[in-house]
Amino acid sequence: MNCLEKITAAAALTAATLLPSAACTSWIIHKSVSASGRMLVQKCRDSHRRPLDADVRRSRHGVKWMRIGMFKHCALFAVSERGLAAIMNDGDDLTVQHPNVARPEINHAHSSIACAEIMRQIMDECATAEQAVKLILHYGRNKTQVGRGQTMFVADPRRAFMVDLGPGYAEAKEVTGGIIIITNCLHLPGIEPLSRKAVTGVRSDRSREANVRTELKKRRVNGKYTVKGTIETSRLRCRKEIQGKYPCRRNSLGGTCFELDPEFPAQLTTAYIALGPQQHTVYLPTPMTIEQFPKEIFDTSWADLAYKLSEREGYDHRFLARIAAFEEKILPEYEQVREEARQLLKAGKKTEAVKLLNDCYARQYAEALKLLKEIDAESVKDPLKGEKIPAEV
């Protein structure tokens, strides 16, 4: 693939420098077990309290895609108008190094590439999940980060894959049904034995995966998994009365659920985006039709509101029910608008469908921002420190 050689050493070095270490929880819900019949890809991002931002970009081929990440540059979550979604989790430190480490004549930083840059390449160059897997395997086996393992999910409306990769190694597995959950340990046979993670660390990661699976199952409707259940699960956190680990942690940065539409991916694929700790912000339905995010999303002031609330109120706080009630209102509203847009698209009325979706987003965005600002003001006026966030999570 000639496109693989077009990445510059400078871009690779920049991405590798900017990408922080993290401890994330992600899952894929296969279309065969989702209530909507669509693929769901969820990522909960943890790191070092760096705010998430988002923007809309165009590939060199003119394909529109949404980037959610950090520093207004790196992509940690992404979805394109082709209905292709990708996310990445940090995995284990490995017992191996990149083959070029032993070659002093090679500038090592310029021969490696971070997953955040691979994400950008996926959005720029790939139309399907299968193509994305081939690209990831290429980088994993040739140019990936030194000594560090990663796990990536890629999915389109029809197929989904999990990929474990490390320096000189990469393995892929197709998700053909059910749900698959990843935290921060590698899983696939070709690379998992190379892990340097202690048994206690692996046990903790697998505990988080098992707990997420249990909680998602509890929230099924008629035996099927829903976006609402995914959002609720993403907000669960470790507490003394609940054994094990959960997705919402002391260093949570936010979450996103991609719902991939097979019929009209460029219009009806949806990103449910929460910037800031999941308990302290709104999951906002965002259609693929928007041309750009509002400035509060890009400049991180939206996420900053959530961070301030988490610092004042702690977790399981007094405003959480109000946030959940707001989502109970806007999620069905959006679903209704999306189905109205679907009928317009079937009738060949693309302009009207796009306007309907974008107007809904603008209205719900304004309502959500107003709510978060009201909560922020109330929290400042009447501070009430919530439950202390446990140091271990």
What are the residue ranges of the model-derived segments?
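Short arginine-rich
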Residues: 141-148
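Hydrophobic h-region of N-terminal signal peptides that target proteins for export
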Residues: 8-21
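Long, hydrophobic, well-ordered secondary-structure blocks that form the structural core
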Residues: 140, 153-154
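Intrinsically disordered, low-complexity regions
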Residues: 1, 15-16, 191, 386
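C-terminal, well-structured catalytic/ligand-binding subdomain of enzymes
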Residues: 23-124, 147, 155-393
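Bacterial N-terminal signal peptides that target proteins for export
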Residues: 1-8
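Acidic, contiguous internal or C-terminal segments within carbohydrate-active enzymes
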Residues: 112, 121-127, 133-139
